From Swiss-Prot:
EC nos: 6.3.5.2
Encoding gene, per UniProt annotation: guaA
MF annotations from Gene Ontology: ATP binding; GMP synthase activity
Reaction equations catalysed: XMP + L-glutamine + ATP + H2O = GMP + L-glutamate + AMP + diphosphate + 2 H(+)
GO cellular component, one term: cytosol
Stated name of the protein: GMP synthase [glutamine-hydrolyzing]
Residue span(s) of domain Glutamine amidotransferase type-1: 8-206
Broad enzyme group: ligase
Active site residues according to the UniProt entry: 85, 180, 182
InterPro entries: Class_I_gatase-like (IPR029062), GATASE (IPR017926), GMP_synth_C (IPR001674), GMP_synth_GATase (IPR004739), GMP_synthase (IPR022955), GMPS_ATP_PPase_dom (IPR025777), NAD/GMP_synthase (IPR022310), Rossmann-like_a/b/a_fold (IPR014729)
Quaternary structure (record): Homodimer.
Amino acid sequence: MNDLKKSPLLILDFGSQYTQLIARRVREMGVYCEIYPYHINHEQFKKLNPCGVILSGGPSTVTHDANPRAPQWLFESDLPLLGICYGMQTMAVQLGGQVHSSALREFGYAELRLHGHSQLLSNIEDRTAVDGSALLDVWMSHGDKVTELPPGFKVICETRNAPIAGMADESRQMYGLQFHPEVTHTLQGLRILQRFVVDICKAPTEWTPEHIIDEAINKIREQVGTEKVLLGLSGGVDSSVVAALLHRAIGEQLVCVFVDTGLLRLNEAEQVLSMFGRHMGIRIIAVNAEDKFLTALKGVTCPEEKRKIIGRTFIEVFDEEAQKLTDIKWLAQGTIYPDVIESAATSTNDAAVVIKSHHNVGGLPDTLNLKLLEPIRELFKDEVRQVGLELGLPHDMVYRHPFPGPGLGVRILAEVKKEYADILRKADAIFIEELHNAQLYHKISQAFAVFLPVKSVGVMGDGRRYDYVICLRAVETVDFMTAHWSQLPWDFLGKVSNRIINEVEGVSRVTYDISGKPPATIEWE
């Protein structure tokens, strides 16, 4: 088959929080795209041979000369270009237009009125005005605005506060949009992006799960040959899909190590070993390291320190098992595209603050001296799930809610003890079971229980109890960057609370977390 990446769409990143969302929308069309920093090298650009370019938004202002600009040679490349928000503004300035800061800023919904005909927006509308003009509901987020068009451009849409909300030079296939078509709040946003990517750029639409799997298998076989591959299997979506993909590609050459940290969900170890070992026939080395992890965590209450200890201990256990396998040449990892983007530091916001270290246990040991294999490093999480389904993994496994790498260690808001982990495991399992029973599980994005290190008075029968408190957390989100707490039915929450208090020894009270993100994070630690 043809190389799926031979003529990608490129997204040049100016630091927008929505840059990855643009890429996900493009991938949804079946088009392969990649994200690069706005200052991409010209030689690298030519080697990529893109079919078109999108300039992302960003937090800077083009009214300051020192702020980011697109490479000037880009505007002489004869490729279709689409600038979004900051991308439109830098396009305007660099091609001879003008941008000024505005006292009338636009943040949130705006009604967009289309001007005449443009290839980008023609026949796309939410409704029509009395005079017959097409109207769109769009999402704005800007303080600056284009006040004078570059030579050769025309206005293609406007809002009340932005007379130039979109511009086009049809002869050179250059377009600018002040609003954000990539967010779901812009109802016709996907159609607009599709018009640019598929119709104007003529991008091939072959980026499908079937083709992705075929190409990945061919690449794995070509890289690995007859050598053996080691994979740390956690039971999470990423490592599970890597295991299934590698097993299909190289069969018995794959060896997995599964580490039971003692901080997993109820029956999780048994489920992973059953699915991948007994049912799929993958060779799995199972290590029960509960005592080692609990000993290492003894007396530690700081969340960041707990993360570091869990990560370090995991590496030690994995390294110990790997050293026993003398014929392994490759180490496979479930690195996905957002990890690659973040590690490549494509964002222009160098002053970003680390809220908490990344949950996923990473940094497997360099001492293994193995070649690295990352078969899903070009996929977003939603694409990983689609590939997993195509490989035959169960829907419930592929669409299981996210679980942090440190496991229950960051859901016990105290020193991690076996007693606390056992209580939390049972309470969490009841919550998840009832969400499934009520057909609510797949309507929310993430749900879990948290163990609180406080005791509360309760009454059971004629006796007085002084036991621990469990807090339930459920959120709804599109991208996990922001989240709303889920408004679960009161009778449902009452049923879950009743079951936990009656069935989990050591719990006298259940609460529900009604904090959004921001200001709270989704996980408590």
